[in-house]
Amino acid sequence: MFSYIHQNFNLDNTAAIHMASKNKNWSNMFRLSATLNEPVDVDILQSSVNEISKRFPTIISCIKKGFFSYYQQSLKTPLLIEKETELLKPMSNKTLANQAIRILYNKHLIHIEFFHAITDGKGGIVFLKALIYEYLKQKENLKINDSTILKAEALPEKEELVDAYTGITTNFKYKAKHNTKKTFQISD
């Protein structure tokens, strides 16, 4: 079931850099994959994506251009999984305005392609683990008690939805110690 509160988010500092550096020669995409022991059940994979969407509103999202800058928006409609085609197919600004993530499948493989502005590698792995857990829970009635797997029924923590770099830089106090003696002097 696909349902959650539609939200807008400011891009964090790193995401803004990815948007500024994006061009036709560098797509800022990365892919994570999982290999299953049996063929992917497409209906269960789609159901799993729908189920975890509310848990990851900043990943199941698109990137829109605002008046002054880009912003992130959780998807209003379900993210549809696709059969794998081209590896890391670039995302144009038009594509990003609709979705900044692709979930692909092919035989025994599940791939997730992320536009780097929505998450980094660690966030991608957290998302992949949650998706695979939800898939196995629905397919095999599997239950795993592992605190590193974020469950679909939990809501995101406030800290997950803000720019972590802001807290790091505002709490950082550094005072340079300068040598006040001149090392050389030019004279007439």
Question: Where are the predicted features?
Answer:
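Non-catalytic N-terminal regions of enzymes
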Residues: 1-164
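Flexible, P/S/T/G-rich "lid" or insertion loops adjacent to the active sites of thioester-utilizing
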Residues: 159-188
